[in-house]
Amino acid sequence: QNTDGGWAYNYNTRAGAHTDLSVTGWNVQALKAAEHGGIKPTKGDIRTALRKAAMYCRKCSKPDGLFTYMQEGREDATARPSLVGVGVLSLQMCGSGSDSAARKGLDWMLKNTNKPFNWKANNTSSNLYQHYYGVQAAMNRGGDVWTAYNRAFRDATLGAQASDGSFAPNGFPGPGGLVNSNGGTINDK
């Protein structure tokens, strides 16, 4: 973990390293799984790391509920719809799910993804990376948030499943093609 609270590819911890919300989200999930599994780190402690990660996630949040790839002031601080779910889920896993950034992110998700998921579209409505995290964040929140998000995503996704159980690459899978569409979809359920 870098001093800014985020993580970088290849676990680069030098000052000014390329930390981003995507890599940070993966590490938050790993730390939370380790915590639930009773695994104790050899250096530092999980709660401190999660507090720092929450701080980093807040630095990547925007007032409108979007999240940026990198924190403000870095080379890629562009707000991206695909990062809202990872930002909200990370804050939830860090114990900061009631933060303003998490609440605004959930509000953004409901306003902008509360429509039927379009499996074949080549836009953010079919971005499995976005929904991989968004489904988990909405489920963690529960209530009306989960009901609305699940309704928008579930039926279209189940309807896209082939008779052999696979999911064809959708309109916005990224470079992983069939592997991405199946792994991302299975994890979303």
Residue positions per predicted region:
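An alpha-helical repeat/solenoid feature that recognizes helix-turn-helix modules
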Residues: 1-155, 162-189
